[in-house]
UniProtKB/Swiss-Prot annotation:
Binding-site residues, Mg(2+): 8, 57
NCBIfam families for the chain: acpS, pantethn_trn
Any GO BP annotation: fatty acid biosynthetic process
Similarity remark: Belongs to the P-Pant transferase superfamily. AcpS family.
GO MF term set: holo-[acyl-carrier-protein] synthase activity; magnesium ion binding
Subcellular location: Cytoplasm
EC number: 2.7.8.7
Keywords: Cytoplasm, Fatty acid biosynthesis, Fatty acid metabolism, Lipid biosynthesis, Lipid metabolism, Magnesium, Metal-binding, Transferase
Reaction(s) this enzyme catalyzes, per UniProt: apo-[ACP] + CoA = holo-[ACP] + adenosine 3',5'-bisphosphate + H(+)
Principal subcellular localization: cytoplasm
Protein name: Holo-[acyl-carrier-protein] synthase
Pfam family membership, one: ACPS
Gene: acpS
Lineage: superkingdom: Bacteria
Length: 125
């Protein structure tokens, strides 16, 4: 049974502006610790951040809370399996919170073009 769905669109140029204005502080706010090593290797960091931002926003919409404790950027990491399929990795606090709501699985799709990054999330209970 579907618990919730969420989607988000982000303009990488907007992210580039935030990076110019706030620098590394902005990236650290968006990324979980486990995403940092991949981020620093990016040739287009604004696209990398736009996709993560969109994915995390879409998750917050799917759970119906928006970004508020414990649904926070730092508690959510986007990872990829061996085939390249994206999935979420959650901090323990968020794992517990998700479990209390009966959410048993999630599905994440991320896409990007030159001027747009998008994410779609489905949560099941």
């Amino acid at each position: 049974m579907i618990y919730g769905i969420g989607t988000d669109l982000v303009d990488p140029a907007r992210i580039a502006g935030s990076l110019e204005r706030y620098g590394e502080r902005f990236a650290r706010r968006v990324l979980a610790d486990s995403e940092w090593s991949e981020y620093v290797r990016q040739t287009r960091p604004e696209v990398f951040l736009a996709k993560r931002f969109a994915a995390k926003e879409a998750f917050s919409k799917a759970v119906g809370t928006g970004l508020r404790t414990p649904v926070m950027f730092g508690n959510i990491a986007v990872q990829h399996d061996t085939q390249g399929k994206p999935y979420f990795e959650f901090h323990q606090e968020l794992i517990d919170w998700i479990g209390q709501r009966g959410i048993v699985s999630h599905h994440l799709s991320i896409s990007d073009e030159l001027t747009l990054a998008s994410a779609f999330v489905v949560l099941e209970k």
